[in-house]
Amino acid sequence: MAVDVEFGVAGWWEAAAPLSPSAVAATFTETWPGSERAEPGRIQHPLWPGSSEGLQLLVCFLLLNSCPGGCSDTSAHDGQDQVGVGQLWPLQGFATPVFQHLQVVLQQIIPQGLFWKDDITQDAMIQKMEHASRLHPQEPCLKDGKALFPTKTTESPLAKVNRDQCFTSEVVSKALKQEVANPVKITYRCSYGGLDMMQAPGPSKEEIIYKIMRLLWATSYCGPQPCG
């Protein structure tokens, strides 16, 4: 049985910045292992983000996305042969707005919660989001090149960081909202004696996790500037 998953990755960038024609027309198509055939030009993926593997990949990606300077702190231990939760997410740069928007969108997509109660991811995410809200009750974003909150000089390093944070925050917010408004397009092709039966169920938790990973990858790859 062939399972084709097609994602349009250009639509959500249109809200943030103009793209080249080739980028606008780009689509993401993958054929997963176990299918009957692998058409030329399609990416072969060894792992579909499942209930446990997908969460692990998401956590690892979030760690890499939020760690400045090579993530040296992620190897620190708390003395009990476990990685200290406080060492996982050093919230600097645009990591704070990314996590803030991610939490809001996840709550909107799945009211019952994306992470299982017995999963360490949920506890870590809750603790870090509470920590982020205490450290950054409000981001001093810039509007039309002027600080909304008092700063010594608009050209100071602090203003530069705030400007990058706010730009990235706006891009992530629009991107995630676009994905919520336009759900993942999933098509399962089942062949029974030469008869193709098409089904288009709603996105599952694993598919939503994968979609968010793609969004965060694009954001971290492009940095505070738009791709294209």
From Swiss-Prot:
Pfam families from the UniProt entry: RESP18 (PF14948)
Protein family according to the UniProt entry: Belongs to the RESP18 family.
Subcellular location: Endoplasmic reticulum; Golgi apparatus; Cytoplasmic vesicle, Secretory vesicle lumen
Tissues and organs where the protein is expressed, per its UniProt entry: Pancreas. Found in alpha, beta and delta cells in the pancreatic islets.
Primary location group: endoplasmic reticulum
Organism in which the protein naturally occurs: Homo sapiens
Described purpose of this protein according to its UniProt entry: May play an important regulatory role in corticotrophs.
Gene Ontology, cellular component aspect: cytoplasmic vesicle; endoplasmic reticulum; Golgi apparatus
InterPro entries per the UniProt record, alphabetical: RESP18, RESP18_dom
UniProt keyword list: Cytoplasmic vesicle, Endoplasmic reticulum, Golgi apparatus
UniProt lineage: Eukaryota, Metazoa, Chordata, Craniata, Vertebrata
Keyword Disulfide bond among record annotations: no
Protein name: Regulated endocrine-specific protein 18
